[in-house]
């Protein structure tokens, strides 16, 4: 119990940080501890999933405590760092004009641990229903019905091209804003997808934000070409050693899929929504024409 916006448990005061956009779960912080509070069934499922991730050695927080609270359920977990890499990279860019070598190295180290743990979940069963649902393809078709035929044709192309890849447990929103100095947070968007989807889109997701002012959000940092090359080659090595095709061979497919995901359910940010609708149409057409999407997004939406 406690003041509005605060909870006190075992003498520790937790202050409200945020409430998830698409789930009735509130997040509180006390020092280096985080508390999540919400419906019991939802959080018990989340805790069980969290423990599964730990079994696969994903770099994620440890759960210290759980229980009933004010008619709901809660659990407390350790912190993985004070700032996510989105914040760190923005500060680097403001202060030094780009992402620092040391911070990029830390980011890469966590991403490598994640990639290796994720491959331990590989499954030859292709759960295409989970992939379809996880990307929000149904929402995309509802919001952009005039593009339905081309969108479904493009998704069929993705499925065909990625047949050589096993499916893995996928974060769904793997990007610098969900990666901290000691691990990864917020698996709330997880689903099953072809191996490499998270890995490639991690460094291309920033292009789903406009660089200019006048929007609810904007892109405030970018990776250098050398950093992109270093990151992608590290990931390619991990996949080669696992006997799998290189993720970069599927960059077009994964960037297109991440664009589907980023385009939907943006009602609360209408300026970004319109910008992403226009952008999706361009990327969809380019993907169906077999154009290079890494080159396109960097040319059209990069610096």
Write out the residue ranges for each language-model feature:
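ATP/Mg2+ or Mg2+-diphosphate-binding catalytic cores
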Residues: 257-303
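Conserved short submotifs of the Hanks-type protein kinase catalytic core
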Residues: 71-84
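An alpha-helical support segment within catalytic cores of ATP-dependent transferases
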Residues: 2, 122-172
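ATP-binding glycine-rich loop module of kinase domains
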Residues: 18-47
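Short beta-strand micro-motifs within the conserved protein kinase catalytic domain, predominantly
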Residues: 62-73
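Active-site acidic catalytic loop and adjacent metal/ATP-binding pocket
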Residues: 18, 24-30, 156-197
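Active-site activation/catalytic loop segments of kinase-like enzymes and analogous catalytic loops
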Residues: 199-243, 255-276
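Conserved kinase catalytic-core helix
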Residues: 83-130, 152, 158-162
């Amino acid at each position: 119990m406690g003041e509005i916006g605060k909870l006190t448990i075992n003498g520790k005061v937790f202050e409200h940080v945020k409430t998830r956009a698409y789930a009735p779960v509130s997040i509180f912080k006390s020092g280096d501890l985080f508390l999540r509070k919400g419906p019991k069934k939802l959080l018990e499922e989340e805790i069980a999933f969290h423990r599964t991730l730990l079994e696969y050695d994903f770099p994620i927080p440890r759960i210290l405590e759980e229980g009933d609270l004010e008619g709901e359920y809660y659990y407390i977990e350790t912190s993985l760092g004070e700032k996510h890499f989105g914040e760190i990279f923005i500060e680097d860019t403001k202060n030094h004009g780009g992402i620092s070598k040391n911070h990029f190295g830390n980011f890469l180290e966590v991403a490598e641990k994640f990639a290796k743990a994720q491959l331990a979940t590989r499954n030859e069963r292709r759960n295409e229903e989970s992939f379809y649902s996880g990307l929000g393809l149904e929402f995309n078709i509802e919001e952009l019905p005039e593009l339905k035929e081309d969108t479904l044709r493009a998704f069929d192309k993705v499925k065909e091209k990625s047949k050589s890849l096993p499916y893995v447990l996928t974060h769904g929103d793997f990007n610098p804003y969900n990666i901290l100095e000691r691990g990864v947070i917020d698996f709330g968007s997880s689903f099953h997808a072809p191996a490499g989807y998270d890995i490639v889109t991690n460094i291309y997701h920033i292009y789903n934000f406009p660089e200019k002012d006048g929007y609810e959000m904007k892109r405030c940092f970018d990776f250098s070409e050398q950093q992109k090359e270093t990151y992608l080659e590290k990931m390619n090595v991990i996949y080669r050693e696992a006997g799998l095709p290189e993720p970069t061979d599927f960059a077009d497919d994964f960037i297109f899929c991440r664009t589907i995901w980023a385009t939907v359910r943006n009602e609360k940010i209408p300026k970004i929504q319109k910008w992403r609708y226009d952008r999706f149409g361009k990327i969809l057409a380019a993907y169906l024409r077999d154009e290079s999407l890494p080159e396109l997004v960097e040319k059209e939406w990069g610096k």
